[in-house]
């Protein structure tokens, strides 16, 4: 609020941004839950022979689920937005930016295992300081001109740079062969589906939600075909096996 000359405008901008951040809380909650479960898991796996493969798989499925949450929130934003005051609907454009920033934050946390396992935790401080400089600098430079939208892009840039640097340095000290090709395909698919959803004008809300549900199913079908065969799910496997008999 101190970056804007008019206190009332500053308060309004802060209220709009804060309200719309609440919409992204689903992804934030998933990331937090993952954090609580992941650290005990990685330290329990430090003696396993296939530990690096397991870490890579955990990263891949984290991104897959996070992108699913992203699509779910964005596709049904017509309904979810009513969890906040209609006065703040003007700020809904920051929601996808915030959610992608949170995705990068979660990936950064996944990547952080390399400096924890190799006892180079000072790198965590370095990355955090770099992120701090980026987010403060971008807010100071752009908030006075662009308002709350600059806050969202500052967070996006901050977490993206931290994520990239952690991956880059981590490959030197503790190389893990993440399935970047597969992760990239899911990210591209999610962004393309989101782009289609927002670029196709459908005035009727029910028809719009129906169309976006089809797009969400496309993502799920791709997931099932490539990384989550139904016959690998215990209960469904029994049903499939019975039918085959």
Where are these regions (language model features)?
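Alpha-helical transmembrane segments of multi-pass membrane transporters/permeases
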Residues: 95, 107, 111-137, 148-156, ...
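Membrane-interface helix termini and inter-helical loops of multi-pass transporters
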Residues: 1-7, 78-89, 201-203
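Specific pore-lining/lateral-gate transmembrane helices of multi-pass inner-membrane transport
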Residues: 16-128
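Membrane-interface helix-loop junctions in multi-pass transport and translocation proteins
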Residues: 7-10, 122, 129-164, 198-214
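Membrane-interface helix caps of multi-pass small-molecule transporters
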Residues: 41, 79, 114, 140-145, ...
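Membrane-proximal transmembrane or re-entrant/amphipathic helices at the cytosolic face
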Residues: 199-245
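Hydrophobic transmembrane alpha-helices of multi-pass small-molecule transporters
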Residues: 25-29, 70, 106, 132-139, ...
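Membrane-interface helix-boundary motifs at transmembrane edges
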Residues: 48-49, 53, 118-120, 171-181, ...
């Amino acid at each position: 609020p101190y970056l804007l000359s008019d206190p009332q405008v500053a308060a309004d901008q802060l209220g709009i941004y804060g309200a719309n951040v609440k919409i992204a809380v689903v992804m934030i909650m998933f990331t937090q839950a993952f954090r609580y479960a992941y650290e005990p898991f990685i330290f329990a796996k430090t003696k396993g022979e296939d530990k690096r493969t397991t870490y890579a798989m955990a990263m891949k499925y984290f991104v897959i689920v996070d992108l699913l949450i992203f699509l779910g929130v964005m596709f049904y934003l017509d309904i979810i937005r009513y969890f906040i005051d209609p006065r703040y609907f003007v700020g809904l454009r920051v929601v996808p930016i915030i959610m992608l920033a949170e995705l990068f934050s979660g990936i950064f946390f996944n990547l952080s295992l390399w400096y924890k396992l190799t006892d180079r935790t000072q790198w965590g401080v370095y990355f955090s300081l770099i992120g701090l400089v980026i987010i403060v600098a971008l807010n100071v430079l752009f908030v006075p001109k662009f308002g709350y939208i600059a806050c969202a892009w500052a967070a996006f840039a901050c977490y993206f740079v931290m994520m990239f640097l952690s991956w880059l340095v981590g490959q030197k000290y503790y190389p893990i062969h993440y399935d970047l090709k597969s992760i990239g395909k899911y990210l591209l698919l999610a962004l393309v589906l989101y782009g289609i959803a927002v670029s196709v004008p459908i005035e009727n809300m029910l028809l719009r939600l129906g169309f976006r549900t089809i797009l969400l199913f496309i993502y799920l079908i791709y997931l099932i075909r490539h990384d989550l065969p139904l016959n690998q799910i215990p209960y469904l496997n029994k049903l499939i096996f019975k039918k085959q008999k």
